């Protein structure tokens, strides 16, 4: 008779273990789905922020370009205007990277392409950071 109880208890334990494993698998799959959804939301928010940042930089560059386009310009103003135009072109090329890369890479070898992109990164980052810094500095002065 003890043997029957041992078999019954073993069967009961095995079925309880199987049910708990099944619940664990279901909860893991639900957790994976939730994580995937949250990652999609984060990517969506990141995309929106990036496009908003690009739009803001384009707007800032256009405003500054219009400011320097009107009236007499010094050599320094002319240089700033050239940089702003280059930044605007580079920002436009971010919207259509395939077309821009096709235009820029026609007739270049790989080393020239690498140098071009390094120069392009410096050309984008330098003026953009300078413009953002100047704009923030002006805002801080107005607030303070």
From Swiss-Prot:
Maximin-4 shows antibacterial activity against both Gram-positive and Gram-negative bacteria. It also shows antimicrobial activity against the fungus C.albicans, but not against A.flavus nor P.uticale. It has little hemolytic activity. It does not possess a significant cytotoxicity against tumor cell lines. It does not possess a significant anti-HIV activity. Maximin-H3 shows antibacterial activity against both Gram-positive and Gram-negative bacteria. It also shows antimicrobial activity against the fungus C.albicans. Shows strong hemolytic activity. It comes from Bombina maxima (Giant fire-bellied toad). The lineage of its organism: Eukaryota, Metazoa, Chordata, Craniata, Vertebrata. It is found in: Secreted. Expressed by the skin glands. Keywords: Amidation, Amphibian defense peptide, Antibiotic, Antimicrobial, Cleavage on pair of basic residues, Cytolysis, Fungicide, Hemolysis, Secreted, Signal. Residues 19-43, 74-123 form a propeptide. Pfam families: Bombinin. The modification Isoleucine amide is found at residue 143. GO terms for biological process: defense response to bacterium; defense response to fungus; killing of cells of another organism. Disulfide bonds: none annotated. Belongs to the bombinin family. Residues 1-18 form the signal peptide. Its main location: secreted. GO terms for cellular component: extracellular region. It comes from the Eukaryota. The keyword Chaperone does not apply. The modification Asparagine amide is found at residue 70. This is Maximins 4/H3 type 1.
């Amino acid at each position: 008779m003890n043997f029957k109880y041992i078999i019954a208890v073993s069967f009961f334990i095995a079925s309880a273990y199987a049910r708990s494993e099944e619940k664990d698998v279901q909860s893991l799959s639900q957790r994976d789905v939730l994580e995937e959804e949250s990652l999609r939301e984060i990517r969506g928010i990141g995309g929106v922020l990036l496009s908003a940042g690009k739009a803001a930089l384009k707007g800032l560059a256009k405003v500054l370009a219009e400011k320097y386009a009107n009236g007499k310009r010094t050599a320094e103003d002319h240089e700033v205007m050239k940089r702003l135009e280059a930044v605007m072109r580079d920002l436009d090329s971010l919207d259509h990277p395939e077309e821009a890369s096709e235009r820029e890479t026609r007739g270049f070898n790989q080393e020239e392409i690498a140098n071009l992109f390094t120069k392009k990164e410096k050309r984008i980052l330098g003026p953009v950071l300078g413009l953002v810094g100047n704009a923030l500095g002006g805002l801080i002065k107005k607030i303070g």
